[in-house]
Amino acid sequence: MATRAFGTCFFEQYAQISLSALLGSEFDCLVNKDRPDLQSPDGKSIGIEVTRAMEESKQAEMALLKDVAGITKGESDHDIDQILEYGYGFGLQGGKYIGLKEFSYWSMALPMRRILESKVSKVGNGFYGHFTKMGLFVFSRENLGATEAVKAMKYTISLQQYLDIRYNRLYIADVDDLFVCNLDDGLKDDSRLIQYRITQEQRQAFYQEAVQRQSIQL
């Protein structure tokens, strides 16, 4: 398995953990590799590229700067202590904080439309190889509603409609939800999207397992 950047790998692990917990055992065996980031062990059944999106707005810019600098461990609640200890904030405190180890990850994020354009172009030219089922998993700094998720889904379908290699699924994860979009041909729009709510207990469990995997890899 290719060596992965520490901060990036946290999100790829978080994606695999949430997919397995919310969608079932099909995703249990995915391993963290490169091009794409998550793959079935056989290297051909399932491939999922993991990325992130953040809108270019003053609000998003301010959120990026709202890290945990200046907060001392033990002065606040358990979530803050974990962010300080492990360096990651996604899934905790409603997404208000960015941990120091994930700061550069989000600082390079593109708006949703631009990241979809980039990733669809890459899958179409074979950059991620050939898999029976190909997925794109996008972490969002903004809490999205179903309407915005549908817009992203429709835009992805339009981008790849003439491509020979394309994504079968689009997964959009914000702090509170996982939107699963079926991109296959021949489906009605109202049957393509399923929204899974992520409880506080699930967020805490996903976070804990992801950071524990980091300590194992070190």
Positions of PLM-derived features:
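A short acidic/basic microdomain associated with nuclease active sites
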Residues: 19-40
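Metal-dependent nuclease catalytic core centered on acidic motifs
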Residues: 1-26, 51-190, 195, 199-206, ...
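Conserved catalytic cores of phosphodiester-cleaving nucleases, focusing on short active-site segments
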Residues: 38, 46-52
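Short acidic-glycine loop/turn motifs at beta-strand connectors
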Residues: 41-43, 174-175
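Extracellular structured ligand-interaction cores
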Residues: 35, 45, 133
